[in-house]
Amino acid sequence: MSITVILIIITVLVSLGAFNSSKIMNDLIFYPPAVSDNNQYYRFITCGFIHADYGHLFFNMISFYFFGQFVENAFEVIFGIAGKLLYLLMYMLALIASLLPTYLKNKNNQYYRSLGASGAVSAVIFAGILLDPANKIYLMFIPFGIPGFVFGPAYLLISAWLDNKGSDNINHSAHIWGAFFGIAFLIVAGYVSGKYNAIGEFMEKVRFYFNS
């Protein structure tokens, strides 16, 4: 069984438990004052395994499934036996990295809560875009696929605009920083291991897309 599927199963089970138990929800949700005042750093991780509702859970997990399977397999091909471990490490660290700006901004805000795997899923999606920028991404209500290298910047710009606007209850900051972390992780892992020139491969695939 793949790491992606295992993470999805765990996330679904924990989220379902939280839907039916306010105690589980409150114990696992990302609440910055609980981190700064009570050293409950585990919340950086646990909040990624609970969701606000069924729609939130479904959208995150279906996105994670399709991109995660591809990225996990690519990591195994590139990094060999260490690939799956690196993939899991990227996902878990992305949960933390994507929330650090949120924490610094809201560490004394007793009214702030955040939950969901979006930051880590964003890291996986953008690692996938870096691996295969020409792969087309399909969205609801748009009758054509958008190449990853076009979708990525557009997604980040829209997320930044929505984050600045601040008119909804979505943590767009986590999406943005999760995306940056996924890109950075693959670049660094490829460089340190000497097994993958992520930037070079990305540029070559984009050039091939325009020349084909």
Q: What name fits each language-model region?
A:
Residues 1-212:
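A detector for small-residue-rich transmembrane helices and their helix-helix packing motifs
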